[in-house]
Regions:
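Cell-envelope and extracellular/periplasmic
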Residues: 2-495
């Protein structure tokens, strides 16, 4: 049986439940759970699969029994909501290292929240299984949980009162490319550059085989030259670089193969995704193409339709990349991903840390992701998003900006640590700029009028463009809707 099946697991409610494994060819395997008995016969390769009928949420611990020539019994199994948490370090970041860890751990007696952590696994080939085990949430265990995942789960649990299962498949410092499926990368016309890289890193493609053969030839020459140099007591040169990646530097598709592929087709509700820092030099179009392909590939693998895929937008942070590029392109791509069906975006531009790429406030990140889930598959009548740029028009030397998700109105707010956003009377809108045809942006004034802002500057008589928080580290960005959710950075131009 795959390790994702185990004691303390949560099965997804209200969806067909695939259960699969390996046995001797021709062996009959029977799966029993919650009064159901389903059987399958292992094929010539030993693979078998049954699909249990959908079940309602159930907090009562039950037994999942799998019986063939041998018997496997999983205990303390609940039925509720299952979410996959993936990305790089800010999703991986444990509660132990987040804000108020001791207080949060002491209050974490939620035995119906469960967490499955997949070890870092990079593979050139799709893996059938993974390692890991399900843990019951308690003050003793929660410190190692994904902090974002835990606060997301806690909010869902409080609102839905059903068991919540989290699958934590993360690897700090990784770009998006290792998380993509080979099929989705190959199918996208936008990813020709990535397709070439995949071929080069594979020893089974003609391109990759040639690369390996060249390396072996160079290595042979180096060994001979080194032996001669040692005899003559001469300096030794560096050996040729190996053409495959180091263990801690996974390449395109390799984390999908090792950490995502083994999970499907386990029924789940959706995905929460926090990644992008390691693609910080990408422009918006390049990253968006990869994000589209990643989402498409995962949905294709699960074959559950367009399941929810909720993304954390990169927060403010003070350091730019070595090439001088900022995260503005990644943030734009993350906004543009909302054109993909059944996606959502948790904006965090107000809760970053200028000096730390790992901001400690994971509580608000989890809550903001949970708003999308509550408004989406769980049908709550709430606004899940902060203001998102909709359009603009020039009028009387000013530019009027309109927003989606601002029906309640806009406010200039103040966010301090974990406290709720409060109005900041008398404060001015920060990080707002305006430019004319010369494309030179000047600091601007802004007036809120309902769900719109009117932007102007005496330095720009004939304005053509506005930008808000459009830089690497707009610390103190303070535009919110009246639900207390921050506006995403935006620009009206494409310069």
């Amino acid at each position: 049986m795959p390790r994702v099946f185990g004691d303390n697991m949560v099965l997804q409610r209200d969806l067909p439940l695939p259960v699969w494994g390996k046995a001797a060819p021709g062996e009959v395997v029977t799966v029993g759970f919650a009064g159901q008995q389903k059987s399958a016969t292992a094929d010539a390769g030993g693979q078998w699969r049954v699909t249990l009928d959908p079940l309602p949420a159930d907090k009562t611990p039950q037994i999942l029994n799998v019986r063939g020539e041998n018997e496997v019994v999983f205990t303390n199994v609940l039925v509720g909501e299952v979410w996959l948490c993936s990305g790089q370090s800010n999703m991986e970041w444990p509660l132990d290292k987040s804000a108020n860890p001791e207080e949060e751990k002491a209050a974490a007696t939620f035995p119906e929240i469960r967490h499955f952590k997949i070890p870092r696994t990079s593979s050139a080939f799709p893996q059938w299984n993974t390692k890991g085990s399900w843990q019951v949430c308690s003050p003793k265990t929660v410190g190692g949980f994904s902090a974002v995942g835990y606060f997301f789960a806690r909010e869902l649990y409080r609102q839905l009162d059903v068991p919540i299962g989290l699958i934590n498949s993360t690897w700090g410092g990784t770009a998006i490319e290792p998380w993509m499926s080979p099929e989705s990368a190959a199918a996208s016309p936008k990813l020709a550059d990535l397709q070439a890289k995949i071929l080069l890193q594979s020893s089974h493609s003609p391109e990759g085989k040639k690369r390996y053969e060249e390396y072996l030839a160079n290595l042979t020459q180096w060994v001979a030259a080194t032996e001669a140099a040692l005899v003559q007591d001469e300096p030794v040169t560096e050996p040729p670089a190996v053409p495959w990646p180091a263990w801690d530097n996974p390449q395109a598709t390799q984390l999908y193969n090792g950490m995502i592929y083994p999970l499907a087709p386990l029924a789940l509700r959706g995905v929460i995704w926090y990644q992008g820092e390691s693609n910080g030099s990408d422009d918006a179009a390049a990253y968006l193409g990869r994000l589209e392909a990643l989402i498409s590939g995962w949905r294709m693998k699960w074959d559950q339709g367009d399941f929810p895929f909720y993304i954390v937008q990169l927060s403010n942070f003070g350091r730019t990349s070595e090439d001088g590029k900022t995260w503005t392109g990644i943030r734009e791509a993350q906004v543009d991903s909302l054109t993909i069906p059944n996606t959502g975006l948790a904006v965090t531009i107000d809760i970053g840390d200028s000096k730390d790429i790992h901001p400690k406030n994971k509580q608000d990140v989890g809550k903001r992701l949970a708003l999308w889930a509550l408004a989406g598959p769980y049908g709550k009548d709430i606004n899940p998003s902060g203001p998102l740029y909709k359009g603009h028009r020039v009028e009387d030397g000013k530019i009027r900006i309109s927003f989606d998700h601002a029906k309640s109105g806009l406010l200039i707010g103040k966010k301090e640590n974990l406290a709720a956003v409060t109005p900041d009377p008398g404060a001015k809108l920060r990080w707002i700029e305006i430019a004319g045809d010369d494309r030179v942006f000047q600091p601007a004034e802004a007036v809120i009028e309902g769900g719109e802002i009117v932007v102007f500057s005496p330095e720009v008589a004939v304005p053509t463009a506005v930008r808000y928080a459009f830089c690497q580290d707009p610390a103190g960005a303070n535009l919110y809707n009246k639900e207390g959710l921050p506006a995403s950075p935006f620009r009206t131009d494409s310069w």
